[in-house]
Design a protein with these regions (language model features):
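Basic polycationic patches enriched in arginine
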Residues: 3-4
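Conserved alpha-helical scaffold segments that buttress catalytic/binding sites
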Residues: 9-329
Length: 329
C-alpha cells in the first residue's frame, strides 16, 4: 500500500472514532471507541441520560455508606466501578458470545440524589427514584454504596413483581434485627423478610463466613462449602433452589476473599476467588432476574483497583445474563 493510501486509511479510521462516548453516542446500542485512559467515565461508556425512552437496562449509582459498621467509603464505589469498567468496553465482552450492546439499549442514569444530612429520608428517596426507572419497564442494575441500599431497592422491585427470591453473594447474612429506625447495612435481609418482599424459602446466600442471629429459613452456602464445590455445582444448587421464581441478584464484593477484593468495609478471610464466582455467575442464565446490584466497594482500601475491577466485571456479567435472556425471548 502506498504511503498516501496508508495515511488516508488512518485518517478514515480516526474519523470513524469519537471520544466521550457517554455524551456523543448517536445510538443507545452503538459501540464505544474511547481509549481506556481517556473520555467521560460512564459505566462501560454507555450514554449518560435521564431519558428512559426505548431503554432496556439502566445502570444507576447510589453513593451511600452511612450504614457501614466498620470501614466507611462505599459512597465512592459507583465512581470506582465506572472507572474500572473502561478496561473492557471496547471489546466483545468475554465470555459472552455476543456484543452486549448490539441489541440491548443500556444507559448510565447517573447517581441517586440523596440528602447527606438526612439519612432517615434515604430509603424513601432510593425507592421513589428506583420506581421511576422500573415504571418505564427498564431493568435496573445498581452500583453501591453499602448494602443498606438493597432494602429500598427490593421494596421498589417487589411492588411490581411481588415477593422475590433473593440470590445473595456475601460473606454476611445481614439478618440482624433492627427497629425499623436504624440505618444498618447488616439488617436489610431481616427487614425484607419482615416486610414480605422476599420469599425466604426461595432465597439463597452464597459465601457466608460469619454468624447471624437468624437465617429465616434462607438456604445458606457457607464459605467452606463453596470451597469444596465446583462452580457448576454451586450454580446448579442456586438454579434448583430458586426455580422459575422471579429473583433479585445482589452481590456484596466482600463475598470474595480479601486477596481478590481488599477494597471493602468488612472483609472476611476464607472466601472464593473472583475466577470461581465469575464462573458461577456465567452459569446462572436460567434465573429470572428482575433486578441486580453490586455493593460495598470502598476504593480507599483498594490496591491497584483490583476490587473495583472485580466489581465492574461482576456488573458486566449481570448485563451479560440480561442480554442473553432478552435474546432468548
Amino acid at each position: 500500500m502506498k504511503r498516501r493510501d496508508t495515511a488516508n486509511l488512518k485518517d478514515a479510521v480516526m474519523a470513524s472514532k469519537t471520544i466521550d462516548h457517554a455524551f456523543t453516542a448517536q445510538s443507545l446500542t452503538s459501540a464505544a471507541s474511547d481509549p481506556t485512559f481517556a473520555g467521560a467515565l460512564s459505566f462501560m461508556r454507555r450514554r449518560f441520560s435521564k431519558d428512559l425512552t426505548d431503554v432496556d437496562t439502566v445502570v444507576w449509582g447510589i453513593p451511600f455508606d452511612a450504614a457501614a459498621s466498620n470501614r466507611p467509603g462505599a459512597r465512592f464505589g459507583p465512581q470506582a466501578i465506572r472507572r474500572a469498567s473502561a478496561i473492557f468496553d471496547n471489546d466483545p465482552q468475554y465470555p459472552f458470545s455476543r456484543d452486549l450492546f448490539a441489541e440491548m439499549a443500556v444507559i448510565d442514569y447517573g447517581d441517586c440524589l440523596l440528602d447527606y444530612g438526612n439519612h432517615q429520608d434515604t430509603p424513601g428517596s432510593i425507592e421513589a427514584q428506583a420506581r421511576t426507572i422500573l415504571d418505564a419497564d427498564a431493568f435496573l442494575l445498581t452500583l453501591g454504596g453499602d448494602h443498606f441500599i438493597t432494602w429500598p431497592l427490593l421494596k421498589a422491585h417487589a411492588a411490581l413483581h411481588g415477593p422475590l427470591a433473593l440470590v445473595q453473594f456475601d460473606a454476611h447474612q445481614d439478618t440482624w434485627f433492627d427497629d425499623n429506625r436504624r440505618i444498618d447495612h447488616g439488617s436489610f435481609v431481616a427487614r425484607a423478610v419482615r416486610d414480605g418482599i422476599i420469599d425466604p424459602a426461595r432465597s439463597i446466600q452464597v459465601g457466608i463466613r460469619t454468624h447471624a442471629p437468624d437465617d429465616f429459613g434462607i438456604r445458606l452456602v457457607h464459605g467452606y462449602e463453596l470451597e469444596e464445590m465446583t462452580a457448576a455445582e454451586v450454580s446448579r444448587l442456586i438454579l434448583d433452589h430458586v426455580g422459575g421464581h422471579p429473583a433479585y441478584l445482589t452481590f456484596d464484593i466482600d463475598c470474595l476473599d480479601p486477596a481478590f477484593a481488599p477494597g471493602t468495609g468488612t472483609p472476611v478471610a476464607g472466601g472464593p476467588s473472583s475466577a470461581k464466582i465469575l464462573s458461577v455467575l456465567h452459569r446462572l442464565g436460567g434465573l429470572d432476574v428482575r433486578g441486580a446490584d453490586v455493593v460495598e466497594v470502598a476504593p480507599a482500601y483498594d490496591h491497584a483497583d483490583v476490587t473495583a475491577i472485580a466489581a465492574a466485571t461482576v456488573a458486566m456479567y449481570m448485563l451479560g445474563l440480561r442480554a442473553e435472556r432478552l435474546s432468548a425471548r
